């Protein structure tokens, strides 16, 4: 079996990882082992917090929608059920924006929903 020399690949890999850790404090930016561990933890936290941020925005959007819907004695879960059954493709973000910038349009939509319920 032939011997494999990896000096250049190893140097490139180390440089790549050390470049990612620029600005970290102490040995975390200059020592390879510490840098590798710090980057793993940073990537894990970034992944987790991206999911958390999305959950947070969903909560905010639902709260905004609910704020307007409560004045009609309707809550978000009922509207969500209505959207799904009628195959209407409006997500939380769009409905939230409409409730802030164009509440009249959302009122028309709610009246349509109430009329649909009366027909059933």
From Swiss-Prot:
Molecular function GO labels: rRNA binding; structural constituent of ribosome
Main location: plastid
Keyword Nuclease: no
Compartment(s) of residence: Plastid
Biological process terms in GO annotation: translation
Keywords, alphabetical: Plastid, Ribonucleoprotein, Ribosomal protein, RNA-binding, rRNA-binding
Matching Pfam families: Ribosomal_L20 (PF00453)
GO CC annotations, alphabetized: plastid; ribonucleoprotein complex; ribosome
UniProt function note: Binds directly to 23S ribosomal RNA and is necessary for the in vitro assembly process of the 50S ribosomal subunit. It is not involved in the protein synthesizing functions of that subunit.
Family: Belongs to the bacterial ribosomal protein bL20 family.
PANTHER family: 39S RIBOSOMAL PROTEIN L20 (PTHR10986)
Protein name: Large ribosomal subunit protein bL20c
Organism: Helicosporidium sp. subsp. Simulium jonesii (Green alga)
Gene that specifies this protein: rpl20
């Amino acid at each position: 079996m032939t011997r494999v020399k990896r000096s250049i690949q190893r140097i490139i890999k180390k440089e790549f990882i050390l470049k990612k850790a620029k600005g970290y404090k102490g040995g975390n930016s200059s020592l390879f082992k510490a840098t590798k561990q710090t980057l793993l933890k940073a990537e894990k936290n970034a992944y987790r917090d991206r999911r958390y941020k999305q959950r947070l925005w969903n909560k905010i959007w639902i709260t905004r929608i609910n704020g307007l819907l409560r004045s009609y004695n309707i809550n978000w879960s009922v509207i969500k059920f209505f959207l799904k059954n009628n195959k209407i493709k409006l997500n939380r973000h769009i409905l939230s924006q409409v409730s802030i910038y164009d509440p009249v349009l959302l009122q028309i939509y709610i009246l349509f929903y109430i009329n649909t319920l009366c027909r059933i």
